[in-house]
Design a protein with these regions (language model features):
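Bacterial signal peptide processing site
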Residues: 24-27
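Short helices/loops that flank or line small-molecule/ion binding pockets
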Residues: 102-103, 111-112, 116-129, 143-145, ...
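Short helix-initiation/N-cap motifs at beta->coil->alpha
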Residues: 48, 95, 110-121, 165, ...
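Periplasmic-binding protein-like
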Residues: 152-159, 222, 226-268, 286-293
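C-terminal motif of bacterial Sec signal peptides marking the signal peptidase cleavage site
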Residues: 18-22
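Extended ligand-binding regions for polar small-molecule ligands
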Residues: 94-103, 161, 177, 182-184, ...
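Flexible hinge/capping segments at coil-to-helix
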Residues: 147, 159-178
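Extracytoplasmic small-molecule ligand-binding "clamshell" domains
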Residues: 58-133
Length: 293
């Protein structure tokens, strides 16, 4: 019925414009909107409300609830998103994504993506959000609507433990060959340093390159380094040395999506009731949490 009303409104618009032009007599008083105009909502993200208005039909929240799933784009990135022994996706981000989906009345579905294609995956509606320890760079914030930052992080240099003493400054890194995840903050850092590097699909693959000796070093997230290298891990002979920067993590949604504001509302409540801290302590990221304003 709404579609018929819209069609009728479009057909009548020229006639109404002529009629109003003839009868206005210079009266500039605002004309009330038609009764069947659909409601709109202002959406916002980490940078505050935007000027974009979404109709009910364009609402991502309504879209998610209608299909019953929140499709989350991820990569294998411990301790944020990774599989347990049974193949289920777990991790701090994965657990919180499930809780967010539950707050919307839907199920979370996880899809591994090529990190370079994350914006294309979002815009093509193959996924509904990117929730994978994503650094809030200017590039990310210009291409997506993002929730408020929730975690602090840094990029660090990973080298064999036996060589760590030789690589304690940025200057000492110049002659090293690096492995970095393509499209990542680590790639940005190695380009800034002017070092040679090999792009790989994931940060986990970058560690494999160093372990195999095909690359001298890797640049990965500090949170991942803390979880995946050193004594008691699969990479006991690797360590990290130089901390290259500091950054913040956030969740990305389609540009103009009302899911960003829904996330902010959810996160504030989940932080207040202890859900966030419980998950953070489970995966050892509690010291990196950013308290909501």
């Amino acid at each position: 019925m709404l579609k018929k009303n819209r069609l009728a409104a479009l057909l009548l618009a020229p006639c109404l414009c002529l009629s109003l032009a003839a009868c206005s007599g210079g009266n500039s008083a605002a004309t009330p909107a038609p009764a069947d105009t659909e409601p709109v909502e202002t959406i916002g993200g980490a940078d505050g409300p935007t000027d974009i208005l979404l109709t009910e039909e364009e609402s991502d929240v309504a879209y998610i609830q209608d299909k019953g799933t929140l499709v989350v784009g991820i990569t294998n990135f411990e301790p944020m998103d990774y599989r347990d022994a049974s193949g289920e996706w777990i991790g701090f981000d994965a657990d919180m994504a499930k809780a967010f989906a539950e707050s919307l009345g839907v199920e979370a579905e996880f899809v591994e993506i090529n990190w370079d294609n994350k914006v294309l995956e979002l815009d093509g509606k193959n996924i509904d959000c990117v929730w994978n320890g994503m650094t809030l760079t200017d590039e990310v914030k210009s291409a997506m609507s993002t929730g408020n930052a929730y975690c602090l992080n840094a990029q660090v240099v990973v080298v064999p433990a036996g060589k760590a003493a030789d690589y304690q400054t940025e200057e000492s890194l110049k002659d090293l060959s690096f492995a970095v995840e393509s499209g990542s903050a680590g790639e940005d850092e190695v380009e800034r340093l002017g070092c040679s590097f090999t792009p790989v699909q994931t940060q986990a693959n970058a560690l494999l390159e160093v372990k195999a000796g095909t690359s001298d070093a890797a640049i990965i997230d500090l949170l991942m380094a803390g979880a995946m290298i050193g004594e008691g891990t699969s990479y006991p002979d690797l360590t990290y040395t130089v901390k290259l920067n500091s950054e913040e993590y956030g969740v990305g949604f389609r540009k103009g999506s009302d899911l960003a504001e829904a996330f902010n509302t959810f996160w504030e409540a989940a932080y207040a009731d202890g859900t966030v801290m419980t998950a953070a302590e489970t995966y050892g990221v509690q010291e990196s949490l950013i308290k909501p304003d």
